[in-house]
């Protein structure tokens, strides 16, 4: 009986030693190493020396992981890591180009400066003749930035097996989150947003925010801004616009349209506001930061102040020196658009209730008072 048991065990042992994983299983071995090296959490774990005589460990594949574990790994990868993973096999490629992974990267990097207008512009962009992705390298132009080059090269390998290759169109939906991310990252997609202190902080635009079309420059991690024409004045272009000077438009409307204010009746001294202003009727509106102040007839004592009951509202722009014609203006609570060709035209008002919005304006305060 004992002899029979020993023979059975030895037979089973030699049989299992003769088994090996199929060749495709080792394709992703290096990707596991990439993940464990790049993941700072995994670096805190004690490294275990593998037995070189064990072929099972050497041939371990990422595809052998449970679904949940694999999803967690992919969810932690940066865009370049997802592209590397997508090169391994068709199964991983399908996972790595999925919207749920790239939507997170879109939201994290671009979410704060992409508004409804940018999403509409993206839909127009992908349906236009300018959206050509005949080659992943065509997106890079002369970028030369190592991260983007690496990312695009990875994508080139992902789709190189397509015989009828027409860029991503044959394998990746044009409206996918991955396509949007790459078009933004490579600067091919110009999206609408607003820029604080336009034209490099030109004195005539201090504490203002104007609509523009923006393109990302991966060399400098800044943007190029293209402002709409002001009357007969040609479109202005500004380079080197930093992330902190950009915001998504708070009002989803054309800069030529008057904003219908819904907070005029509740304005009181001390409120922070943005007001539309334009030099003349041919120009688009910009948004300007200001404060609501007390009437001249009021001593400023909050216990006796009745300014909030008056039909006249005093607006103050403290970036201008006392006595400047731009320092103060008065509007009516039934205000629509007021002004003239000399002082410009004041349009709609937004009351700022968000502390983050107010703090953003204060961060762009000029170094010195303007005349």
From Swiss-Prot:
InterPro entries: F-box-like_dom_sf, F-box_dom. Gene3D superfamilies: 1.20.1280.50. This is F-box protein At2g32560. It comes from Arabidopsis thaliana. Residues 59-105 form the F-box domain. It holds the Pfam family F-box-like. PANTHER family: ESTS AU081301(E20138) (PTHR31482), F-BOX DOMAIN-CONTAINING PROTEIN (PTHR31482:SF2). Transmembrane segments: none annotated.
